[in-house]
């Protein structure tokens, strides 16, 4: 015994228990959980006890059995049924529809196999039953003898076996005939009847018959008295015999009540006894006993049959095996097998010899233990382990469903009328999906869903009527929800809640079984109300019948007989210590007493009919087996099946009790008996399948627990590895031989298949060859026909091609002729066009020559007129001047007009020639450039009005600025361009308060600015010529020549005319040449500039000022308007201050930046001053600004000698500087630059206008030093602060100094609103920087 057994016993004593302990065994707790459990903790530890050891080594403490203990154990049976009920119901509910269908599909062969197997089994066990009869105690000998005599008497009169009676036909043949007859009868009613449907209909008939049976008039009390009276004369008994009889009666009642519901036990007895009475009265079977004793014995036998039916059912069905002794099976298991089993038990169960022997004895008594042991010995337990694994997997998926039962009568009738009801229950859908739909598509939370279920459960509970067993006052929606919850995935929880509510409400009125039954019946009514409208289709398929029959069985069996299966399963588990872990020890212990009683009852089975030559007990035993199978399987159909099977069994026995085949039983009764027997057989098959399925599930759990024990015993297995290895080798050898046999069989089959395949291939090849020949013949014929058609097609195409070529040839010839005519016509048209073109050219040339000649004459006439007008102007000037005209001509000989100037004549001719040329017709645009070059030159004619020796050259400072004003020309290219434009109106700007005409510098004194305007006369004399130059815009296109022709004409003209003519006067400025510089050139001298002005009667300098000696640059030819590459030379009279502007010098350094030209052709300046960049030289250049030098020079001349603080009037200085052809804007900008450079000082009045300027004397080096832009800015800002001057760009008064240059009437500076000077003086010529070439 293991060392820990004492600890187990000590624990048992500490608990103080006195009842039997049984360990969970290998399959429940494992090796490590060895404890002694007490059923009743309040009792003391049993003093009369038996200490045993379980096969797995656990200690078992059992008290000695006593009668009170047995009675108490039997009383506890009903309380332990509820646990099994839940397990069985859960197992059936969790079976898949396919598994349920498989259980309900019963074939004909299976029915007859079941009949044959149980018939043979009962025949083979006749000897065993006889031996059991001999073991009965002495107290039962009298009873057994009496019954034996009765049996002998029955034998002499008639035989009840399946061979001797009737037509001496075997039972199997008779049942097959009856089966076929019943099947044909069913087929006459149903065309689509099959064997499966036939079997299910038989079960339905059984259920219907149960509901229609009439209760017998006899009472159970009278029957019991009759049984007692029949037994009392035969027993001659002692007290022990009476005790045995009482025990037998008590045992019989308890067993019947155990397997049937309490309400149906008395009804079943009445029906059986009534049936027996009717049969006996009908056949009048003679018996040797007196009438009273016979009736008593029959009643006693009938009661005995009821119990024997149930007990034999337990043993023979394999669900609860009856214990057998070792002597009964001595012939089955020999000594050698016993020794092997004993060694196995010692190795794997327990090393204790007593325990091992006990295991072998139980194994011999129970075939399932023997099968398990053989599997462990032969296959190393692989089958058992696999079964355990499957069981565990199924157990994990298994859930217990609510304890709801459906009344068999209602559900059977409903499903009989609506065969598809079970399937449509599944079609209701998931309850959660339905609630989601009711909740507008939003799923309920878990709490809301639980609350809804609880509400429906309470509503159903309150609406249940215990009298009518129906739900009243429930809405259709509540019924729908109830049905979906009952069939949903969480139906177990919902069912538990429903059941609990019913128990709480009706626990005082109803028992638990009645609650479940009532609830199921009412639930089936609700479900039927929901589903029944959907049973539209009356055509039931085989699967549908299987399914709803399955549900029918489930419903009917759940109503009445779940308690029976609970006991069956527990009874069976008690016999195997190996499988005893599924239920606790209390459930198994209660069957110990029952097994003892079974041993006693088995000894009394000889009370049934027995024959000397035949085994008459076979039939009755068979019926008993079938009847009890009804009661033992999963609990389905137990009541109806047992009830009906008991009747069939009794009926069949009584029928056999008739004397002979020629009895009064007709064919209909035979068929009815066969139907009942088939009902019993089919019911037994269904019950066996359900129980097998259930035990398979349970075995899976047992397997997993056994695996745990096997792992715990791994150390023991290592010690005996050699023995196992030999066994495994033997098993492998057997498997190898079996595999070899299978392989040979497989090879034979493959060879046969190969041979058949080759034969088939040969036949196929022959067929294909025949087919190929047929196809080739057909193809050959088809090809010939195709060739013939192709040949015909080719001939047709050749003919069509020939006709097409003929048509094409004709068409080609026509096209050639048409093209030839078109070419000739085009040639003639071309010749005609050429002739017309030549004629037109000749006409144009003649017209052009005429036009040129006319233009030349017009130019000569205009030039002549101009010269005449010039002479007149000069004469008028000379007459108005104080100086005589002759002296004036003598002083300025260069101003005399040169009438024979060839250049002037050529200039007019070229202008006349180019004016007729169209700009767009010139490919090189030279004509356009020539026009611009002409426009960029202005003819500087002699200005006689500026040289007036007698007019007085002294200027007065009084009214110089007030009487003079400046006017500005419009923004045109220059004077010539403005005159050439015929559309420009010759308007004259107002001259203000001055009476002096514009362009006049004939000043006789400082107080008078009067003088004749020679410049105006000069411009007027030039108008005809300039107008002629612009006449090309109206020349017609047809009179134009190409540019090349015109150029050639001009070249020829120039070549024939001498260009060597010299000017008659040396000092005169010649006209600018056409091919000369594009920049501004002076064509004449200005007498007004020939002398320097001096204050207070200083003599005028007689040296004339030319463009070279006043510092105005003489530009050279430029290729574009942006070209400033040519250097500019400045010369300033006798001072010889010269400088050159480099090619990289920007144009803005020459043109004042304060007033920029608004366009590139305008010689004037903009009205918008640009003060941000005053006119200063680049500090990096070693240059001096010539305009600044002019201002300084004029200022120094106006300043008295040796006077350092003398201020000069700014108006006088402005007049002197502007006499050098400098714009006022340039003058003022340079004046500000000089002030910023601290070379001059400026004085202003209260209005901020510059009134006086003073020269600041510095050294010569500082005078020549270039101005710095930063210093200029700083000094400018400082000067503004010192003198309170406003910035030049200031617009405080809303006025801005502006200039307008190159007006047609002269150059005028308009500063009427200026902050600096309020002057309106005209100047004779525009600024030298008034065009883009300067």
Swiss-Prot record:
Family statement: Belongs to the NST1 family.
Function: May act as a negative regulator of salt tolerance.
Entry-linked InterPro entries: MAP7_domain-containing, NST1
Entry keyword annotation includes tRNA-binding: no
Record-given protein name: Stress response protein NST1
Pfam families per record: NST1
Keyword terms of this UniProt record: Coiled coil, Cytoplasm, Stress response
Composition skew (Basic residues), residue ranges: 1-14
Domain of life: Eukaryota
Lineage, opening ranks: Eukaryota, Fungi, Dikarya, Ascomycota, Saccharomycotina
Chain's gene name: NST1
GO cellular component: microtubule cytoskeleton; P-body
Coiled-coil annotated spans: 694-876
């Amino acid at each position: 015994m293991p060392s820990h057994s004492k600890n187990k016993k000590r624990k048992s004593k500490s608990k103080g228990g006195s009842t039997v302990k049984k360990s969970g065994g290998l399959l429940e707790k494992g090796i490590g959980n060895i404890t002694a459990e007490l059923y009743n903790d309040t009792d003391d530890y049993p003093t009369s006890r038996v200490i045993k050891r379980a096969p797995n080594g656990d200690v078992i403490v059992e008290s000695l059995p006593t009668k009170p203990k047995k009675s108490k154990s039997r009383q506890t049976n009903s309380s332990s049924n509820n646990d099994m009920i839940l397990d069985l119901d859960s197992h059936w509910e969790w079976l898949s529809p396919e598994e349920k269908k498989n259980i309900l599909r019963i074939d004909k062969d299976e029915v007859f196999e079941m009949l044959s197997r149980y018939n043979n089994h009962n025949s083979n066990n006749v000897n065993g039953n006889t031996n059991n009869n001999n073991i009965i105690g002495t107290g039962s000998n009298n009873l057994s003898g009496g019954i034996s005599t009765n049996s002998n008497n029955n034998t002499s009169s008639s035989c009840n076996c399946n061979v001797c009676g009737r037509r001496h036909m075997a039972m199997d043949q008779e049942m097959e005939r009856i089966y076929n007859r019943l099947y044909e009868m069913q087929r006459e009613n149903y065309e689509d009847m099959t064997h499966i449907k036939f079997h299910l209909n038989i079960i339905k008939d059984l259920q219907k018959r149960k509901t229609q049976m009439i209760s017998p008039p006899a009472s159970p009390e009278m029957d019991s008295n009759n049984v007692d009276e029949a037994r009392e004369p035969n027993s001659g008994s002692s007290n022990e015999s009476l005790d045995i009889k009482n025990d037998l009666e008590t045992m019989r009642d308890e067993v019947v009540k155990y397997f049937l519901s309490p309400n149906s036990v008395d009804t079943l007895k009445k029906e059986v006894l009534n049936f027996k009475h009717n049969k006996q009265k009908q056949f009048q079977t003679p018996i040797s006993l007196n009438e009273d004793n016979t009736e008593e014995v029959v009643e006693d036998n009938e009661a005995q049959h009821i119990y024997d039916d149930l007990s034999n059912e337990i043993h023979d069905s394999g669900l609860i095996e009856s214990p057998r002794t070792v002597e009964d099976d001595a012939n089955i298991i020999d000594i050698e097998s016993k020794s092997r089993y004993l060694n196995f038990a010692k190795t794997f169960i327990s090393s204790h010899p007593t325990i091992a022997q006990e295991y072998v004895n139980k194994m011999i008594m129970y075939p399932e233990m023997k099968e398990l042991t053989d599997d462990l010995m032969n296959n190393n337990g692989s089958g058992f382990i696999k079964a355990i694994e499957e069981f565990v997997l199924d157990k994990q998926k298994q859930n217990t469903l609510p304890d709801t039962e459906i009344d068999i009568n209602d559900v059977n009738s409903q499903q009989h009328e609506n065969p598809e009801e079970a399937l449509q229950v599944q079609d209701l859908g998931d309850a959660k999906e339905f609630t989601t739909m009711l909740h507008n598509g939003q799923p309920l939370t878990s709490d809301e869903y639980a609350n809804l279920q609880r509400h429906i459960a309470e509503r159903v509970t309150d609406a249940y009527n215990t009298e009518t067993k129906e739900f009243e006052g429930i809405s259709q929606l509540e019924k729908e929800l109830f049905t979906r919850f009952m069939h949903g995935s969480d139906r177990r929880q919902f069912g538990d809640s429903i059941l609990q509510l019913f128990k709480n409400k009706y626990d005082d009125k109803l028992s638990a079984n009645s609650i479940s039954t009532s609830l199921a019946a009412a639930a089936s009514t609700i479900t039927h109300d929901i589903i029944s409208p959907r049973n539209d289709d009356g055509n039931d398929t085989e699967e549908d019948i299987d399914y709803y029959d399955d549900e029918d069985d489930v419903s009917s069996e759940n109503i009445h007989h779940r308690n029976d299966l609970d006991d069956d399963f527990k009874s069976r588990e008690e016999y195997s210590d190996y499988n005893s872990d599924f239920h606790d020890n209390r459930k198994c212990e209660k069957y110990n007493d029952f097994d003892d009683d079974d041993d006693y009852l088995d000894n009394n089975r000889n009370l049934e009919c027995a024959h000397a030559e035949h085994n008459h007990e076979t039939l009755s035993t068979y019926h008993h087996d079938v009847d009890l199978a009804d009661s033992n399987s999963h609990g389905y159909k137990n009541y109806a099946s047992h009830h009906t099977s008991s009747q069939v069994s009794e009926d069949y026995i009584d029928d056999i009790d008739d004397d002979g085949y020629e009895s009064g039983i007709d064919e209909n009764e035979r068929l009815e008996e066969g139907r009942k027997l088939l009902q019993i057989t089919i019911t037994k098959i269904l019950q066996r399948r359900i129980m097998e399925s259930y035990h398979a599930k349970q075995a899976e759990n047992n397997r997993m627990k056994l695996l745990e024990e096997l792992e715990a015993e791994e150390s023991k297995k290592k010690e005996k590895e050699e023995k196992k290895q030999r066994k495994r080798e033997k098993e492998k050898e057997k498997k190898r031989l079996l595999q070899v046999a299978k392989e040979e069989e497989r090879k034979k089959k493959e060879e046969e298949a190969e041979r058949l395949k080759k034969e088939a291939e040969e036949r196929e090849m022959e067929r294909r060859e025949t087919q190929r020949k047929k196809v080739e013949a057909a193809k050959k014929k088809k090809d010939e026909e195709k060739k013939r058609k192709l040949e015909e097609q080719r001939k047709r195409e050749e003919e069509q091609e020939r006709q097409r070529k003929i048509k094409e040839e004709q068409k080609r010839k026509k096209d050639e002729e048409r093209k030839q005519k078109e070419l000739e016509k085009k040639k003639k048209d071309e010749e005609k066009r050429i002739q017309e073109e030549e004629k037109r050219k000749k006409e144009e040339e003649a017209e052009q020559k005429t036009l040129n000649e006319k233009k030349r004459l017009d130019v000569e006439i205009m030039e002549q007129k101009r010269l005449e007008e010039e002479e007149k102007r000069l004469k008028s000037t000379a007459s108005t001047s104080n100086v005589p005209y002759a002296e004036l001509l003598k002083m300025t000989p260069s101003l005399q007009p040169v009438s024979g100037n060839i250049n002037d004549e050529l200039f007019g001719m070229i202008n006349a020639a180019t004016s007729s040329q169209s700009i767009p017709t010139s490919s090189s645009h030279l004509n356009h450039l020539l026009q611009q070059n002409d426009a960029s030159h202005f003819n500087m004619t002699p200005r006689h009005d500026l040289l007036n020796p007698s007019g007085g050259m002294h200027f007065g400072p009084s009214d110089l600025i007030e009487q003079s004003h400046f006017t500005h020309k419009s923004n045109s290219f220059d004077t010539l361009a403005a005159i050439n434009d015929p559309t420009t109106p010759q308007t004259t700007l107002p001259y203000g308060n001055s009476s002096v005409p514009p362009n006049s510098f004939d000043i006789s004194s400082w107080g008078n600015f009067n003088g004749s305007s020679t410049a105006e006369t000069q411009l007027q004399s030039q108008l005809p010529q300039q107008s002629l130059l612009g006449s090309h815009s109206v020349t017609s296109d047809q009179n134009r020549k190409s540019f090349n022709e015109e150029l050639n004409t001009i070249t020829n003209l120039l070549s024939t005319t001498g260009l060597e003519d010299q000017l008659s006067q040396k000092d005169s400025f010649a006209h600018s040449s056409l091919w000369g510089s594009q920049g501004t050139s002076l064509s004449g001298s200005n007498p007004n500039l020939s002398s320097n002005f001096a204050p207070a009667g200083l003599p005028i300098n007689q040296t004339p000022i030319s463009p070279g000696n006043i510092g105005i640059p003489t530009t050279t030819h430029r290729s574009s308007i942006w070209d400033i590459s040519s250097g500019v030379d400045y010369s300033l009279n006798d001072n010889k201050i010269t400088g050159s502007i480099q090619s990289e010098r920007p144009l803005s350094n020459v043109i004042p930046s304060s007033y920029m030209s608004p366009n590139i052709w305008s010689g004037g300046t903009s009205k918008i001053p640009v003060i941000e960049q005053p006119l200063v030289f680049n500090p990096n250049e070693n240059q001096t600004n010539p305009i600044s030098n002019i201002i300084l020079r004029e200022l120094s001349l106006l300043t008295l000698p040796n006077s350092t603080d003398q201020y000069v009037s700014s108006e006088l200085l402005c007049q002197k500087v502007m006499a050098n052809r400098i714009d006022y804007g340039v003058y003022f900008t340079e004046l500000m630059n000089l002030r910023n450079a601290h070379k001059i000082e400026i004085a202003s009045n209260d209005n901020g206008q510059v009134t006086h300027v003073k020269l600041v004397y510095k050294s010569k080096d500082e005078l020549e030093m270039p101005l710095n832009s930063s210093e200029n800015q700083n000094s400018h800002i400082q000067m503004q602060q010192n003198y309170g001057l406003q910035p030049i760009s200031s617009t405080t008064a809303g006025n801005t100094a502006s200039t307008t240059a190159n007006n047609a009437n002269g150059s005028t500076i308009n500063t009427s609103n200026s902050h600096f000077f309020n002057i309106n003086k005209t100047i004779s010529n525009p600024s030298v920087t008034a065009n883009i070439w300067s």
